[in-house]
Amino acid sequence: ELKNIVSHFAIRGTVSEIKPLGAGLINDTLLVTTAEADAPNYVLQRVNTNVFPDVDLVMRNIYAVTTHIRKKLEAAGETEIDRKVLTFMPAKDDETKLYAIVDGQYWRMMIFIENAVTKQAVNPESSRAAGKAFGQFQAMLADIPVELGETIKDFHNMEFRLQQLREVIAKDPVGRVAEPEVQAMLKEIDARAEYMCQAERMGREGILPKRVCH
């Protein structure tokens, strides 16, 4: 069944093994190993449509972002570009699509970046490297020439998030609102609420430009 899903994508090489990869909480992720030494291995993902209902929009955003970053890296004379930006594989039936629908499920494939690791334990060195990577990401996308779509409505809208919180507090579904520890956290949030919503207001007023968020 998994090999059938892979067959919907325009990849190089013959599939020799497919096994789970990583411990992600949102999408189902698999490593696709190829038999040929000159063919890359791949990552196969089933996109969670409960979280991302508009997969086409998600993938169009990804295409815009990765294409822009790739051009920036090429212009800067960077080496090993395929290690620095993701390469998604087109669907066989439509090379403009970076996903395939198989039995109602949405799948995507990308080239696997060999010898890459995910840090589970945080230390100052890793934090510094992560901060640098996010900074480079933001800098490269500051002049992206297209407007990306909002994949999860109001995901970063703190006014909306605080309203959600207040509605849950009013209902108190598990009877914990009165607990001292919970009250302390709620007071802390309330004290910072004005500041938390400042960016949203400044964005509406045109003071802050929209930026791409990872």
Question: What annotation goes with each model-predicted range?
Answer:
Residues K19-A23, Q45-R46, F52-D56, I113-R128, ...:
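ATP-dependent phospho-/nucleotidyl transfer catalytic cores
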